[in-house]
């Protein structure tokens, strides 16, 4: 967000502008963590630590019921929501309750769980490794699919007493599901339905800024970004979110930053909540994860991380080159939504993905949707969530 630095300095140096103070309103949620935000809207919550097989500790949040529901009821069907790249569980609760999927599901009578990927703001602990060490950050979406997703699903089912759950993934949250559900048959049996929002398998045609990483060598990327964390939320970005982007004067500038990452759809963004949207973004990931995405852009395949030389690949995969994941092996019933203005999950990549989904039960392309509309869009309840909840209800009746 360096482009905002000059703007901020100009604002601070120039002093008051006509109407400037009157337009400065910060939403209280912009300074809240996940548990505080859930409580703020009157919902109950639980915080659980998922411990993966390789020692990562993942912060997982539960909304066991809606505002008007009693805790003392029969076991509820479980819905597990998993965010995308450099994001967090905050995505599912950052809008008003009538526009946030997690709250809508809770009010519809479901037991809602919000996952956080390793290395983000809420999942930055380990049984043995320090986040200050490069060893902690030696992961990508391979490990999220192999370790994070199974561990989280198993804990959720254990705590809820259920045998299956409904899985909702956005962006990278769909990527790790495609991998996990196609390579781990026992895990796949525990998924009743898979809802894929802005699904990402290949990124051959992506137009997102991450494509710029492909112009750099691995060595250059590590010189620029190091070998640990990539793009975490800083005090400066929090300042921009709560002191600049909360002002109507800068709504267009701040929203254009979001659109540059996701695609253009200004009519569908609640500008009055820009400070909330930006206050916990980005939530961070590993440099290795970003290198893996750059590899995916170059290869045009959904492939395991290339460790850089045949010996390393042989050690990890028992073959000289990283294996390609075969999504067609996934048998989980799957519903998908894609966006016509999505610069991350490009329409051509989605078109190539569709025939590989062996049990596709529903697909909808929304022409005006960008990558973030699936959790930020003001019309998401009408375009996506209504049908998603209906499919859950129909599945439970069968």
From Swiss-Prot:
Catalytic residues in the record: 171 (nucleophile), 342 (charge relay system), 371 (charge relay system)
GO CC, alphabetical: extracellular region
Molecular function GO labels: hydrolase activity, acting on ester bonds
Record keywords: Disulfide bond, Glycoprotein, Hydrolase, Lipid degradation, Lipid metabolism, Secreted, Signal
Domain AB hydrolase-1 residues, every copy: 78-377
Localization (cell): Secreted
Cysteine disulfide links: 245-254
EC number(s) reported in the record: 3.1.1.-
Record's protein name: Lipase member K
Record gene name: Lipk
